[in-house]
C-alpha cells in the first residue's frame, strides 16, 4: 500500500511562512478595518511583519509539513 502524504493546513499556509533559518514569519493583526481612529504611527507599526517564538512556532511548523 502507498504511503499516505501529510496534508498542509491551508489556513496556516495563508497566514504563516517558514523561513530558511527556521523562524516563522507572520503579519500583525488589527489592520483591516476601523482604521480611522488609529494613529498613523500605530498603522505604520502594524505594517511590519513579526516572528513567532517557542511553542507557537513549533505548533505552526507541524501544520506546515512541506515548508
From Swiss-Prot:
Return the SUPFAM superfamilies for the record: L35p-like
The record's annotation in InterPro entries points to: Ribosomal_bL35, Ribosomal_bL35-like, Ribosomal_bL35_CS, Ribosomal_bL35_sf
NCBIfam families with a match to the protein in the record: rpmI_bact
Q: Which family does it belong to?
A: Belongs to the bacterial ribosomal protein bL35 family.
Q: Name one GO molecular function term.
A: structural constituent of ribosome
Task: Give the record's keywords alphabetically.
Answer: Ribonucleoprotein, Ribosomal protein
Pfam families named in the record: Ribosomal_L35p
Q: What is the lineage of its organism?
A: Bacteria, Bacillati, Bacillota, Clostridia, Thermoanaerobacterales
The record's listing under Gene3D superfamilies reads:
4.10.410.60
Name the domain of life this protein comes from: Bacteria
- Gene from which the chain derives: rpmI
What do the Gene Ontology cellular component annotations say?
cytosolic large ribosomal subunit
- Protein's name according to its UniProt entry: Large ribosomal subunit protein bL35
Q: Which PANTHER family match?
A: 54S RIBOSOMAL PROTEIN BL35M, LARGE RIBOSOMAL SUBUNIT PROTEIN BL35M
- Alphabetical GO biological process terms: translation
Amino acid at each position: 500500500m502507498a504511503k499516505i502524504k501529510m496534508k498542509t493546513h491551508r489556513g496556516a499556509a495563508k497566514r504563516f511562512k517558514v523561513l530558511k533559518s527556521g523562524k516563522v514569519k507572520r503579519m500583525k493583526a488589527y489592520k483591516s478595518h476601523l482604521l480611522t481612529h488609529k494613529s498613523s504611527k500605530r498603522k505604520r507599526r502594524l505594517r511590519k511583519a513579526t516572528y513567532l517564538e517557542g511553542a507557537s512556532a513549533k505548533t505552526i511548523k507541524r501544520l506546515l509539513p512541506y515548508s
